Design a protein with these regions (language model features):
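Catalytic donor nucleotide-activated moiety binding site of glycosyltransferases and closely related
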Residues: 26-61
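A structural signal for isolated positions on well-ordered beta-strands in alpha/beta enzyme cores
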Residues: 2, 39-41, 94
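Alpha-helix N-cap and loop-to-helix initiation/capping positions
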Residues: 17-24, 63-64
């Protein structure tokens, strides 16, 4: 299992998560991997300088997200833009909480409570051609106009208040 981390104070993390800490995510995933006899690989955000406590069985990745994604059974992240690299592979992508990348047959929005069931069923509902179509949309439309257009004003105000509380 591959866990791609996001900066905790990044707007994507704040907007799309339940403001859980990366250390909490790691601890949770380490427990799930132990219970299911799985190997955990984590990749911190390149700008994250915080020290994380990991078990000896957890690997820290330094190479490309896309390369690692090709070698694992599942990828999990909190709306990291690195998800775009995963979408270029055939590996199932699971997005914790809300995400701009969560679309039917592209990548699945989940909560932490869903992970054990995902591993036990091992039946991802994702489709490569739909991923390709979604990537084309992202590259040709979404990125041209900006992410903010996809939110209503109430949501933008709420999230900007959360950001200001941190600052």
């Amino acid at each position: 299992m591959f866990l791609v981390l996001q900066l905790e104070h990044d707007s994507q993390f704040i907007v799309h998560s339940d403001v859980i800490k990366n250390q909490d995510l790691i601890t949770y995933f380490e427990r799930v991997c132990e219970e299911n006899d799985r190997q955990l690989i984590i990749k911190s955000h390149p700008l994250d300088i915080k020290s994380l406590k990991i078990k000896a069985t957890t690997q820290v990745a330094y190479s490309c997200v896309k390369k690692i994604s090709r070698e694992v059974d599942y990828v999990f992240t909190v709306n990291s833009s690195a998800a775009l690299l995963v979408l270029e592979t055939t590996t199932p992508l699971y997005l914790l909480y809300d995400s701009i990348f969560a679309h039917d047959k592209v990548a699945e929005k989940i909560s932490l409570n869903d992970i054990n069931e995902i591993i036990s069923k091992n039946e991802p509902q994702q489709n490569i051609s739909q991923r390709e179509n979604f990537l084309n949309y992202i590259k040709n439309n979404y990125l041209l106009y900006g992410a903010g257009f996809s939110y209503d004003k109430v949501n933008i105000r709420q999230k900007s208040n959360q950001i200001m509380d941190i600052v």
